[in-house]
Amino acid sequence: YLLPAAQTRDKSAVNEEQMKELTNKLKEEFDYILIDCPAGIEQGFKNAIAGADRAIVVTTAEISAIRDADRIIGLLESSEIKNPELVINRIRPNMVRKGEMMDVDDIVDLLSIDLIGVVPDDEYIITQTNKGEPVIQNRKAPSGKAYIEIAKRVLGEKIEVTIPGREQGFFARLKRLFRK
């Protein structure tokens, strides 16, 4: 089921207490309730997190987005939501290699929270979004694979995070360790 939020300027349409009530009622029927928070840290954000038990912070590898994510993490940790997790969106491996985009490890070090997924900047996302179709329909597309892996981690599976453009496995990790 999907319940989209109203696109109004008035973020007081639902207050924090009402959001808690709503999520508590939904918890009786559903195992997972995903709430997409509005950008920024205004009242809409505070209302959205009022009923949350867990938070996934989604950011891009841009300095301004990472600063915003850091502020969000601070707010989440000062509320009742502990141990927020991180998804890094729109990573471009070629830009990371050239030093034009921050590396995933640097972002994780800066934000100091657990990484549960990295989504590559993939043209497939644009085409699927424009068609109104889910990206995960194509499990072979890099973005589709990334979302499937994130879902598995949310459900508790312990699988390695795939970082686009990076070799995976034990020896690759060992090589990276000695490079530092």
Task: Please name every model-derived segment.
Residues 1, 30, 45, 124, ...:
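Phenylalanine-focused residue identity feature
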Residues 1-28, 127-136:
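P-loop/Walker-type NTP enzyme "switch/lid" segment
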Residues 6-8, 90, 121-122, 141:
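Short, solvent-exposed coil/turn elements at secondary-structure transition points
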Residues 14, 67, 102, 138, ...:
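Conserved active-site and cofactor/substrate-binding residues in soluble primary-metabolism enzymes
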Residues 17, 21, 25-28, 32-121, ...:
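Conserved catalytic-core segment of NTP-binding enzymes
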Residues 131-180:
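NTP-binding/hydrolysis catalytic cores, primarily Walker-type P-loop NTPases
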